[in-house]
């Protein structure tokens, strides 16, 4: 491992030990904000420091074993120790490289998840509903909270568009690669001839930004419309213009929120989604200028814009970005999508490592 990387790891270990001492300090314990900040930093360093300690121990094992090579009785055991330690060192170094990759500061944030029906008419709306259930069940398995912000239901079931907020630990980092076109191939319930149809939905995932990171939005750039909610809620929603639609005129971005009975609450939620969309759109524009590696946040919803295909007759799901196919469609649609998400994250980390190697 390079000296510069070892020096970096040693400085992280020093900071970790410093934080350990600080967290036992009475003055820090009595200051909740400071204690919370130090605890978070401590937990973020824990894995990399433990990994580095293991690397140090393995190198020490090799040094001690090499001394025993001159002893005829211990030579065979020492050689075995050296071989095993060297093999593990390779694995640990790979792990350390990944742990030292630049972190996306947004990964720890909650996120907004948008699903929109694209081509395919009613069937696309039904599939949007299926995707919503898939993500909801996945969130449930992770003990995340899903909060409905806006839902435009389609006539045959499902949604023309649905927007939810997903809250929990590391939500955006886990879901961000779900953005893109999702295609379904199956025989619709409304199809009498038994023909397979292809429909599409687009998914967009955006981090919920803290107030300190939200862009300044000029009120003069906004058009705010209120209307009666079409969702559940009985008589109340039919008599109150509580739903809010905000249009950001310079970018043309439109956000609707109708989940709350209070117009004020709906407006606050819509403004938060709008801020995230504006920031994300700008980041996407900058990324497009620099590299083609990052995918567009939200495609057209056309069949050609696809990251994943769900084929019901064959019971398979294919992720086209990494040519991954699994034949457990029922499990996937019931929320077991870690085996689709983790390989994408691993591939992204490999791309980052390759880019760093080229720079060095």
From Swiss-Prot:
Disulfide bonds: none annotated. GO terms for cellular component: cytoplasm. Residues 285-309 are annotated as: Disordered. It is found in: Cytoplasm. The modification N5-methylglutamine is found at residue 235. Transmembrane segments: none annotated. One of its GO terms (molecular function) is translation release factor activity, codon specific. Methylated by PrmC. Methylation increases the termination efficiency of RF1. Keywords: Cytoplasm, Methylation, Protein biosynthesis. InterPro entries: PCRF, Pep_chain_release_fac_I, Pep_chain_release_fac_I_sf, Prokaryotic/Mito_RF, RF-1. Residues 285-295 have a biased composition (Basic and acidic residues). Pfam families: PCRF (PF03462), RF-1 (PF00472). Belongs to the prokaryotic/mitochondrial release factor family. Peptide chain release factor 1 directs the termination of translation in response to the peptide chain termination codons UAG and UAA. This is Peptide chain release factor 1. It comes from Haemophilus influenzae (strain 86-028NP). The gene is prfA.
């Amino acid at each position: 491992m390079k000296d510069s990387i070892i020096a970096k790891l040693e400085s992280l270990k020093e900071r970790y030990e410093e934080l350990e001492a600080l967290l036992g300090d009475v003055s820090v314990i009595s200051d909740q904000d400071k204690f919370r900040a130090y605890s978070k930093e401590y937990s973020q360093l824990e894995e990399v420091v433990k990994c580095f300690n293991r690397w140090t121990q393995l190198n020490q094992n090799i040094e001690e074993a090499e001394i025993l090579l001159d002893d005829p009785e211990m030579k065979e055991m020492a050689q075995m120790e050296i071989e095993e330690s060297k093999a593990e060192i390779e694995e640990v170094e790979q792990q350390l490289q990944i742990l030292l990759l630049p972190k996306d500061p947004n990964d720890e944030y909650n996120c907004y998840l948008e699903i929109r029906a694209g081509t395919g008419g009613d069937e696309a709306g039904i599939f949007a509903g299926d995707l919503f259930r898939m993500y909801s069940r996945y969130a449930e398995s992770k003990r995340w909270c899903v909060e409905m912000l806006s839902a435009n239901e389609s006539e045959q079931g499902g949604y023309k568009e649905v927007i939810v907020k997903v809250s929990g630990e590391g939500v955006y980092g886990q879901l961000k690669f779900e953005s893109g076109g999702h295609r379904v191939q199956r025989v619709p319930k409304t199809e009498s001839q038994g023909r397979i149809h292809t429909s599409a939905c687009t998914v967009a995932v955006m981090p919920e930004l803290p107030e300190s990171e939200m862009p300044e939005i000029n009120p003069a750039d906004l058009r705010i419309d209120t209307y009666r909610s079409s969702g559940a809620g009985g008589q109340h929603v039919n008599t109150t213009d509580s739903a809010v639609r905000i249009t950001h005129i310079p970018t043309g971005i439109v956000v609707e929120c109708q989940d709350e009975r209070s117009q004020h609450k709906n407006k606050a939620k819509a403004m938060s989604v709008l801020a995230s969309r504006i920031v994300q759109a700008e980041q996407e524009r900058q990324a497009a200028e620099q590299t083609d590696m990052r995918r567009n946040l939200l495609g057209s919803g056309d069949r050609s814009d696809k990251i994943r295909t769900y084929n019901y007759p064959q019971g398979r799901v294919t992720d086209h970005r990494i040519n991954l196919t699994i034949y457990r469609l029922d499990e996937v649609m019931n929320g077991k999508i870690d085996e689709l998400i983790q390989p994408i994250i691993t591939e992204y980390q490999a791309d980052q490592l390759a880019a760093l190697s080229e720079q060095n």
